Every structure is written in C-alpha cells, then in structure tokens.
C-alpha cells in the first residue's frame, strides 16, 4: 500500500535540520498534491509566543493542504508504525523518541478502504494513549478524530476536484486547539497575536507561499493591513 503524509503546516517547509532530513529521507516531495481539507488557525502555540498554528476543524470551510507520498511501501502494521514515529519525530523536532503523541497533539491515521485491517491495529496500538487523543473541539462541531486516533473526516479530494487515488492511507498530525468559550478565536485575534510577536508571522506567510491556505487568510491579511500598512513584515500573497 502507498502511504501519504497529510500536511497542514510547517513540517512541509521548515528548514530545521530534523525536518529537512525527514522530508529528504522519507517523502517524495516532488510528488506533493494539493488537497481540500477543513483547516484553520486554531492553536496558540507556546513555542511561538502564543501565535496561532494550524488545526483540523470539522466546521471549517475547506482550505488547501498537502499530501506527500512516502518513499517506502506499507506492507505491514510495523511499516505503518515506522512512518508514524518518523512523522512524530519531525513534528516534535526530536532525534529520538518511541512516541507518536503527547498532550498537545498526536499522530492520526485515515484509511481509504474502511475494511482495511490497519485501522483496527492502529486503534489497538493507541489504546494506551487515549488522553493524548482526546483533543478538544468547538461546542458546535463534531470532533476531527476519535479516541483511537482515526481521522473523522471524509477522504480528501484534490483541490481541482479530482479524486485522490495516489495513496491508500494518510498519516497526519492533529494538534490540540486553543478554545475561548467553547469556540475558536476569530481572524482579528489571530492577526493581533502575530502583530504583537511579528518574529513568528513567518508561519502564516510561509504556509501561503507554499500553498497551504485557509478560509481565514484574506481576513487575517486584512487585519494586518488595517493595523499597519504593509502588514507585519511578510510578503503580500
């Protein structure tokens, strides 16, 4: 089976040595595919001075993410676990770890064929990490994942409307969102966080530069321009 990594943020473009090595050794970056998935800026990341990073949100309109095929074929659950652990190392920027989750986020699986036995094996493996997989979500939306770490969204389509047939299963990182009164903050608050900490606005601009976009982007840009001409240092896309 062909696995792919569904990427909604900086592990696609970050030049950190660990992430660069992961992309080079495990992914076919030249074959990256634009796909439509419901994403938004929704996690206030402590590592980025509480500016916002990307999360899955089932009530969000579709944005653009990336699916990148893995180099290695998946022939067994052990093969899948190797890819999941490599993905988690890249996300957490660690050189050694046997984990695929933490309190702030977790590795998710989506299989195209519902009868695929890998999903059941995945659920059994993640049983010891249920607290990590109990991610918050807005009061008025269904969760993006279940307690066993299976992504609870339809199999994505390409942004051009074509079916995604190049991969049979997807691995991705789902981060715990930061909610306020049971909901996500709006684009003005998201922009304000970057305006206060402009050294971290590269996350937004580099996402856009690399084709990772959300339904909120135009409003976030509008808030940048309204607050100070030229935005907060990044290029205008």
Regions inferred by a protein language model and the residue ranges of each:
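Glycine-aromatic micro-motifs
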Residues: 1-237
């Amino acid at each position: 089976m062909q696995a792919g990594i569904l990427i909604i943020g900086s592990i696609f473009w970050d030049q950190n040595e660990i992430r660069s090595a992961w992309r080079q050794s495990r992914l076919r970056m030249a074959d990256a595919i634009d796909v439509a998935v419901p994403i938004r800026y929704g996690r206030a990341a402590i590592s980025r001075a509480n500016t916002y990073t990307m999360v899955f949100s089932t009530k969000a309109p579709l944005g653009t993410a990336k699916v990148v095929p893995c180099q290695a074929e998946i022939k067994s659950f052990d093969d899948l676990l190797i890819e999941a652990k490599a993905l988690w190392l890249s996300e957490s920027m660690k050189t050694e770890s046997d984990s695929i989750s933490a309190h702030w986020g977790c590795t998710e699986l989506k299989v195209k064929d519902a009868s695929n036995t890998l999903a059941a094996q995945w659920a059994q493996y993640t049983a010891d990490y249920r607290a990590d997989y109990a991610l918050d979500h807005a009061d008025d939306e269904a969760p993006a994942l279940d307690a066993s770490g299976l992504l609870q969204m339809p199999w994505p389509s390409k942004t051009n409307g074509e079916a995604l047939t190049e991969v049979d299963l997807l691995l991705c990182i789902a981060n715990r969102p930061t909610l306020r009164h049971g909901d996500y903050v709006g684009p003005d608050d998201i922009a304000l966080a970057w305006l206060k900490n402009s050294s971290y606005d590269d996350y937004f601009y580099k996402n856009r530069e690399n084709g990772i976009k959300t339904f909120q982007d135009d409003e976030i840009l509008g808030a940048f321009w309204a607050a100070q001409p030229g935005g907060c240092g990044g290029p205008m896309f």
